[in-house]
Amino acid sequence: MAIKLIVGLGNPGQEYMFTRHNAGFWFVLHLAQQFNITLAPDKKFHGVTGRGQIHGHDVRLLMPLTFMNKSGQSVVPMVKFYGIDNDELLIAHDELDIPAGSIKLKTDGGHGGHNGLRDITPHIGNDFHRLRVGIGHPGHKSKVSGHVLSKAAPDEQIAIDSALSAAFDALPLLLGGDVEKARSQINGFKLPE
């Protein structure tokens, strides 16, 4: 199946826009900009939504405005309203367990402690596609909140942006339904030495 809905998880508000936790938002914002898709507030879905053509495929975009730990309040109604099957759903989110500059495409699995996914999976299951954008782990769990809610250092941000570019390059495969080739291309990305 082809991807019909791309969700970018993050927190609303200018104070959070450039924090690591908003890596999913960055992905969707870049898509909207690159493919001239207008994003607008949509009260029905508690988020910012858009629809347009990406590499010849009709795709909806969503950025929940519910704060991360309430992402299900936005994602679930949109999935149900448009009849999006889980194999047609891609959720982009930050991932602590992957170093900055790495990116992974995964299907299935638990929430891995990610509060946005934790709020979504009880309602739709966990067999959807996830674009896991590495932001690195601060080392101790007591530092996680401060880490995800702060800006990446300039070298980390460059690494994250490079990883996101690798995902953009694989989009034609993913949108066309060739998930395995897209996964191989995305998961094989390595930062230049």
Curated annotation (Swiss-Prot):
GO cellular component, one term: cytoplasm
EC nos: 3.1.1.29
Catalytic activity: an N-acyl-L-alpha-aminoacyl-tRNA + H2O = an N-acyl-L-amino acid + a tRNA + H(+)
Keyword Hydrolase: yes
This protein's UniProt keywords: Cytoplasm, Hydrolase, RNA-binding, tRNA-binding
GO molecular function, one term: tRNA binding
Catalytic center residues: 21
CDD domains per record: PTH
Major enzyme class: hydrolase
Stabilizes the basic form of H active site to accept a proton, annotated site positions: 94
Pfam families reported in the protein's UniProt record: Pept_tRNA_hydro (PF01195)
Site-annotated residues for Discriminates between blocked and unblocked aminoacyl-tRNA: 11
Complex and partners: Monomer.
Database matches in HAMAP family: Pept_tRNA_hydro_bact
Functional description taken from the UniProt entry: Hydrolyzes ribosome-free peptidyl-tRNAs (with 1 or more amino acids incorporated), which drop off the ribosome during protein synthesis, or as a result of ribosome stalling. Catalyzes the release of premature peptidyl moieties from peptidyl-tRNA molecules trapped in stalled 50S ribosomal subunits, and thus maintains levels of free tRNAs and 50S ribosomes.
Name the record gives this protein: Peptidyl-tRNA hydrolase
